[in-house]
Amino acid sequence: MKLFDVYPLFDVNIVKGKGCHVWDDKGQEYLDLYGGHAVISIGHAHPHYVETISKQVATLGFYSNSVINKLQQEVADRLGAISGYDDYQLFLINSGAEANENALKLASFYNGRTRVISFAKAFHGRTSLAVEVTNNPKIIAPINDNGHVTYLPLNDTEALKAELAKGDVCAVIIEGIQGVGGIQLPSTEFMKAIRQACDETNTVMILDEIQSGYGRSGKFFAHQYNDVRPDMITVAKGIGNGFPMAGVLISPKFTPVYGQLGTTFGGNHLACAAAIAVLDVMKAENLVENAAKVGTHLLDELKGFKGIKEVRGRGLMIGMEFEEPIKELRQKLLFEEKVFTGVSGTNVIRLLPPLCLSMNEADEFLTRLHRLIK
């Protein structure tokens, strides 16, 4: 059987990782400034993470959500404490798309409406509702194009107010920082306008923190820079450091009903062990603070590079926009300088390294980049 060929692949076979470095099958070492699409939060093969999930899988890897799993409550308690959302409820699933899918579904259960506001360049996933609120017609199949979504320009407060004033909007879904859209930041004024308009119209505010959350921005959630509290927050990627896991943080105003939401694998014992290990390391090694410190250093230094048109971001979620397409530059970074980076569109390179990136590793990246664009 052949693999279904949907991924354009680099000719690199990564077989080992440690911290912010990975190695291919020829023994070549690379500096990982992408973390597998922002997934690696505490670093590759962290000893505590390896030990925790190894012990768990040797004891019990999985049983269904028909029995008590005390690890789920431990994840909820720990996540609530570190994030500042200890009064919220947690629903555990497997992926970011699934998190957004369930958040939108719950919002519609709540107010009975079907129209959703999303934003230009938004990305929220590839499943039914999640892809419909993603502003990319190329990945929306006809069966997903159901007319539920109105796309608005990011940071256009007047357009937002006008749409919500119609009284038929189920939810507004917005990323804490747009990732696939090129590291675009919503303004504090705009975020507060969303919160106020949602309150006035019984509309649900959903914050997609799948890429921007879990400490990546230098705060636990990127929206905490904007001083708002959404009705739901979706998380994935960094929550499991590579183990498939996701969650929806849900306001107390939502009352759960048996059977309303469900999942086979979500919140399984092994996934919870991975999530607990991640939270252990984040706290012990002050990784949120490290993301803020090292990220600020990178942002400040990159803004001094003459070849870069604009640098955007917060913490270790950084976009570098160039005047010219960056395909060749990204390939040179990988194959000549041995650095993994990401991309957005044709002109933006994204940096999404593990949160344990050191100052020395950041400076090493700057040196390698400078050799290519000096």
Where are these regions (language model features)?
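Conserved N-terminal phosphate-binding loop of PLP-dependent enzymes in the Aspartate aminotransferase
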Residues: 1-374
